[in-house]
């Protein structure tokens, strides 16, 4: 072949190749979008199991408590009141949200009039409970100065209520020192018990769930989170315990609105203190009640005795899902138990030689080092770590926002450096004695006094200067989820510089105790040290050494406990010296008071939603302040990188619209060391987890709130593991008889990112620091401008360019039919044509170059090839 022919052939192949490649790539992108749209459309039509059990009642509706008296002095105040309870069926130990509208605004400051009182009651009568069946009368002692006389109690004052009976049934047994004393109360009758006048044997201010006073705003609306207790938390109510019929006992949520008129017709302003008086259990106040029936899920296991048992272990992120699935899995003939343990311990069980060790562990990160035998990872749930909060607006005197004083704050923004400050006791209020020594004396008292926090949350600039949380509540122990939080913090250059001792632009420095820990260089950091050993005592009456960090800022038992404490606004600090205690010691001051609560905790999204908590918007590496929801978690999952068979978040990657603390939990199974029975049971479990277990809903067996259902490709991965476990031939091929494995597990690795998408044009070394301005923000839009602090001197290390989610590759799952067209088959053909075009595009220039060489040899080089 002469040079001219080679040149012509090469040119022709180049043109054909470039054309075919461009056309094929364009069509691949188009069909990829169609495939993704089909997958999203498929998932969007899934119906929730159990349906919506929210219940709304109008006070004027006579269907439950009968007709209201239009001549009642409070009729006008309550006639437009409408209350909604967010969930009334399939209840467990959780919170429900009570919202209302049409009320009159609560008096400013104290709860003098026009507020709601909420309680939980038992009662088997279909008409609802009687006052003696309600858990009421053990308020926080600090509330006595905020409400009227007896409004927080069960006690009655003779003659105060014309409709109330003052008889022997309501008489309090007189003390021996005054046998003629006549005092009255509404007794409490526990389920299955006799009436008592002293409730202390059944509930106290520390255990009750009663809401003494809930504020109505100037617009007539209000909201409150009500803890719902089962028979496990409140045996005296018996909610959810099995009746003789086998059905779980139902209970009631009762709302008693308080107006501006006392039971005897006098106005509240004429009472001592200008407040409405009298117990909500007295006859007149009780006649104003609204009752909501509550249906509970059965308490305890419903699996039949004699079932085969399989013990599963894993982390806390999976606990809520497994609790929901367990009873539904009983029908498989196997009882699946679940032990919540640390991730490292769960991984170690997979390779343990101890009898009874589980061969299925739910973890967030793979075994490291990888064992000799094959371990398969099946995605089971995806959720997020969140910072949940209960914060009441506490405005300064004269604030322009004072009309909302005492209502719930509904937006909070935190960036990595603020979280670093909270985790390192760098605010003076988080150190015993208030950090009176150098250098902490120059730091803000609490996060509310931090200019960086105010820049992100300008509304809180009008809070009183004494407002602030009892620290950021965190759990004891280690967790892969905690490691992910630290990676998010340390990946931020401003937070990293702060932890290394650099002051922020306002002069605040890290607590030096934590600077000495060198947290930024600890690759295995997966817990929250409380390293400041300072102690404090108020005076000489308190024995040395006084109280310490663990008294002031105690750990929570786990993330669920953290959520529960946040809902109650009770961190459990024990810093009040009680000389009457035997022996004398530090005690808790109890929960924060309504209207002045400021509580924050690190927890999981499922627990936060179970307890009805708001969650902070966290600043991601792209500079956006985002809350955890289905969209932001999905964006994070789509951008995850693969590490040894699992997908994890790369904290250095800048992904727009992605919530930074999104996590995927995997069921890890060492295929060869699991027995045949175990593999079969694990396969059954995984198939349930990948099908019915991914349908969101309230019913047992559904996917609880706080979890993002698995995508199609993830369900395919899960099914592949289940199929392997159920295939003896595949197992035999994977596990030759000669193979042995006795490895040990050790802490999970720090993930190494792999190229997953087209690099983001914005360098990753640009700090995210004080991030997106508060306010609602579209995850797909650029963040609003925010104050940028002075760049720290050290943290500018280069990192790998991050993928841009707008142009990055998408992971393809199995073909999905849409509109009657097999998109997968079409894509396969396009892949082939694109590949052929690429080959032509490569071969063409090669032939042209060869023609040039041959022409040189022949002495026929033409000028257009020079």
Task: Please describe what each predicted stretch is.
Residues 2-37, 100, 833-849:
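Secretory targeting and sorting signals
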Residues 6-9, 857-862:
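Short helical patches
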Residues 7, 12, 16-19, 24, ...:
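A detector of low-complexity, intrinsically disordered, Ser/Thr/Gly/Pro/Ala-rich segments
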Residues 32-42, 853-858:
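Ser/Thr/Pro/Gly-rich low-complexity linker/stalk segments immediately outside membranes or between
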Residues 42-69, 73-753, 769-789, 794, ...:
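Flexible loop/hinge segments at secondary-structure junctions
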């Amino acid at each position: 072949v002469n040079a001219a022919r080679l040149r012509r052939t090469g040119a022709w192949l180049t043109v054909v190749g470039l054309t075919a490649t461009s056309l094929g790539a364009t069509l691949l992108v188009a069909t990829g979008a169609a495939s993704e749209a089909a997958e999203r459309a498929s998932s969007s039509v899934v119906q929730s199991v159990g349906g919506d059990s929210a219940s709304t009642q109008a006070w004027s509706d006579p269907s439950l408590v009968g007709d209201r008296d239009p001549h009642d002095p409070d009729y006008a105040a309550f006639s437009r009141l409408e209350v909604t309870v967010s969930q009334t069926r399939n209840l467990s130990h959780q919170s429900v949200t009570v919202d209302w509208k049409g009320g009159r605004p609560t008096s400013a400051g104290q709860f003098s009039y026009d507020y709601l009182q909420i309680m939980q009651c038992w009662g088997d009568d279909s008409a609802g409970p009687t006052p003696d069946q309600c858990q009421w009368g053990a308020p926080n002692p600090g509330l006595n100065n905020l409400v009227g006389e007896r409004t927080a109690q069960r006690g009655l004052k003779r003659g105060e209520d014309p409709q109330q009976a003052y008889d022997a049934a309501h008489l309090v047994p007189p003390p021996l020192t005054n046998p003629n004393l006549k005092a009255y109360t509404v007794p409490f009758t526990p389920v299955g018990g006799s009436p008592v006048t002293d409730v202390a044997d059944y509930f106290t201010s520390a255990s009750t769930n009663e809401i003494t006073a809930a504020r109505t705003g100037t617009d007539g609306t209000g909201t409150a989170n009500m803890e719902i207790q089962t028979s496990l938390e409140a045996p005296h109510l018996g909610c959810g315990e099995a009746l003789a019929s086998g059905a779980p006992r139902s209970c009631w949520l009762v709302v008693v609105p308080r107006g501006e008129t006392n039971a005897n017709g006098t106005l509240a302003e004429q009472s001592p203190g200008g407040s409405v008086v009298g117990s909500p259990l007295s006859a007149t106040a009780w006649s104003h009640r609204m009752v909501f029936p509550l249906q509970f899920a059965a308490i305890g296991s419903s699996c039949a005795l004699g079932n085969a048992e399989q013990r599963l272990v894993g982390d806390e992120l999976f606990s809520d899902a497994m609790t929901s699935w367990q009873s539904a899995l009983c029908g498989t003939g196997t009882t699946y138990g679940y032990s919540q343990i640390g991730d490292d311990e769960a991984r170690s069980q997979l390779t343990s030689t101890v009898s009874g060790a589980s061969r299925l562990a739910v973890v967030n990160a793979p075994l490291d080092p990888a064992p000799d035998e094959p371990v398969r990872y099946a995605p089971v749930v995806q959720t997020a770590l969140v910072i949940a909060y209960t914060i009441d607006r506490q405005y300064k005197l004269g604030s322009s926002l004072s009309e909302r004083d005492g209502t719930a704050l509904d937006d909070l923004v935190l960036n990595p450096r603020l979280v670093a400050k909270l985790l390192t006791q760098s605010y003076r209020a988080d150190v015993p004695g208030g950090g009176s020594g150098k250098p902490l004396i120059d730091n803000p008292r609490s996060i509310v006094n931090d200019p960086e926090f105010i820049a992100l949350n300008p509304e809180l600039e009008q809070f009183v200067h004494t407002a602030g949380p009892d620290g950021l509540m965190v759990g004891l122990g280690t967790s892969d989820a905690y490691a992910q939080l630290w990676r998010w913090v340390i990946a931020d250059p401003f937070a990293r510089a702060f932890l290394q001792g650099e002051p922020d632009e306002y002069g605040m420095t890290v607590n030096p105790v934590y600077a000495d820990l060198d947290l930024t260089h600890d690759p295995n950091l997966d817990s929250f040290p409380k390293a400041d050993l300072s102690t404090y005592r108020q005076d000489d009456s308190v024995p040395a050494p006084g109280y310490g960090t663990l008294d002031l800022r105690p750990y929570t038992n786990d993330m669920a406990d953290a959520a529960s404490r946040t809902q109650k606004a009770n961190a459990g600090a024990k810093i009040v010296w009680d000389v009457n205690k035997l022996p004398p010691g530090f005690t808790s001051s109890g929960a924060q008071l309504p209207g002045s609560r400021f509580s924050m905790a690190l927890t999981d999204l499922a627990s936060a939603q179970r307890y009805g908590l708001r969650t902070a918007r966290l600043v991601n590496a792209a500079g956006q302040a985002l809350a955890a929801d289905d969209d932001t978690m999905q964006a994070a999952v789509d951008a995850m990188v693969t590490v040894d068979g699992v997908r994890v978040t790369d904290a250095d990657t800048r992904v727009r619209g992605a919530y930074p603390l999104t996590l995927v939990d995997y069921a890890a199974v060492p295929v060869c060391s699991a027995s045949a029975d175990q593999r079969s049971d694990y396969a059954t479990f995984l198939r349930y987890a990948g099908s019915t277990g991914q349908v969101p809903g309230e019913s047992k067996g559904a996917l609880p709130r706080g979890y993002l259902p698995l995508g199609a490709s993830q369900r395919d991965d899960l099914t592949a593991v289940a199929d392997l476990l159920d295939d003896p031939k595949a197992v035999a091929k994977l596990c030759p008889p000669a193979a042995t494995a006795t490895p040990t597990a050790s802490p999970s690795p720090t993930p190494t990112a792999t190229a997953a998408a087209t690099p983001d044009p914005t360098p990753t070394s640009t700090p995210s620091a004080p991030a997106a301005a508060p306010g609602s923000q579209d995850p797909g839009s650029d963040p609003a401008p925010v104050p940028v602090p002075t760049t720290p001197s050290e943290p500018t290390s280069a990192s790998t360019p991050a993928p841009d989610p707008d142009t990055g590759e998408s992971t393809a799952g199995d073909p999905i039919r849409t509109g009657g067209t097999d998109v997968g088959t079409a894509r396969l053909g396009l892949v082939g044509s694109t590949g052929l075009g690429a080959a032509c595009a490569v071969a063409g220039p090669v032939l042209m170059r060869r023609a040039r060489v041959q022409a040189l040899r022949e002495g026929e080089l033409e000028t257009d090839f020079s």
